[in-house]
Amino acid sequence: MKKILPILLVAVLALTGCTTKNQYAGTYTGTFKFFKFATTDISQGATSSDSKSGKMQFLTNPLTNGLFLYSVIPLSSVTPEQYVSNSGMLDYLDLLLDNIGYQNNVYNSATEYIKNIGITVVFNGNSVHAEVQYEIALIGGVLTSRITIVEFDGTR
């Protein structure tokens, strides 16, 4: 028994000290906030917003131990000129979030991109905050800026 106890203790400590992306997998229920823009020039900022209840789901990718963000967000297009909040047109956002969940929660966030749409996800315990942002070019494309068009706050 004296020989087994230290081995068992080391095994338990190894399992508890090493976190993986699996700890963030699951369904988060919360509120989507859709920002509205008065003109096609979204750099002027949002004029109002709508909120709707919804869910975001994170699935584990067994090949890379990453997370798939699987979420249904009404985005009629990836261009702000055609973006209408709550338009009813659904795009599925399947993103592989690879840089989440290293040992001891050193990292608990990731940003991934689809074309000029960026998704930033931050986990905090059983809570998640996600932002969908549109990248716009400024000064002839020399500089870029990101404008938030959708936010999500939820808990597991």
What name fits each language-model region?
Residues 25-68, 111-118:
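Short, solvent-exposed loop/hinge segments that bridge or flank secondary-structure elements
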Residues 33-36, 70-77, 133-139:
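Short, solvent-exposed aromatic-acidic interface loops
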Residues 1-18:
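Sec-dependent bacterial lipoprotein signal peptides
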Residues 17-31, 122-125, 156:
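N-terminal helix-cap/turn-to-beta initiation motif at the start of protein domains
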